C-alpha cells in the first residue's frame, strides 16, 4: 500500500548513495565528493557519476523521492557539489530506528540488511574500500574508479532492498495508519536530517577573538566564583565539592530527614534532587 501510494505521489523514486573524503567525525571537514550512484526504482535505471563536481541531480527535486541510508551524508555531498537540496527524502536509517530503537545494537546499512537477510558485501570489504581505497587517495586511476563505483552501487542496491523490507514491516506495525500518514511522517524525518546537514554545512559564525578571551580567562573566573560561593555555603575544597561538606550543609538547613538517599545510604546529589530542594532552600539554590 505504501509503495503504491509513493508511486502515485512521486514520478521518480531514487535510491542514492555517495562516497566522499573528509574527516567529519573528528575535524568537522566538509565532504569532498568522490562519486554518486543513483538507481531509479520504477524503471531500474542506474546513473553513475565520478568526480568532485555535479552540474545537476539526475531527477527533478519536486517530482522525486530520494532514498538514502543516513540522509545527512548524501545531503552534505549534494551541498558540496554546489547544488540545492532535494525536497523529499526517505531515510532508511531513521526508519530503522523507529522500528527497532532499543531492540538492536546497530542501525548501519549492513546491520539493517543482515536482520532482513539481505545480501551485502562483508564489513571487512567495506572497510577496505573506505580506508584503503577511497580515503587515502586524492586521485584515482580508471580501475580504482570502476571499483569505487561498483562498491557504491552495491550499497544502493542493498538499500533498495532494505527500503522494500521496511515498507513491508511498517505496514504490519502500523496497519491501522493510512499510507499517506506514514509517508508524511517519513518525509518529515528525512527532511529534518537534510536540514541538519544544511546547518552543519553552513556552519555557525563564531567570534573567535571573544571565544579565545573567554577560554583564556575562564579558569580564573571559575575559581573566583567558587571562592565567593564557598564563602556562603562551604561545600567546596580546592574547587571540588566534597560530600562531607555537602552533608553538613544539608544538615544545617534541617533537610536530612527529607533528603533522598542512594542505595548505599549516601545523600543524592543528582541534578533532579538538587533542583527539587533548590525551590525552597536558598543555600541549595545558590
What are these regions (language model features)?
Residues 1-19, 28-30, 35, 129-286:
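Conserved "right-hand" nucleotidyltransferase catalytic core of DNA-directed polymerases
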Residues 20-21, 73:
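Short active-site-proximal "capping" loops at secondary-structure junctions
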Residues 6-10, 57-63:
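Flexible, charged surface loops at secondary-structure boundaries
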Residues 31-34, 38, 42-51, 59, ...:
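Active-site-proximal helix-loop-helix substrate-binding element of RNase H-like nuclease domains
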Residues 1-2, 51-57:
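A generic local structural motif
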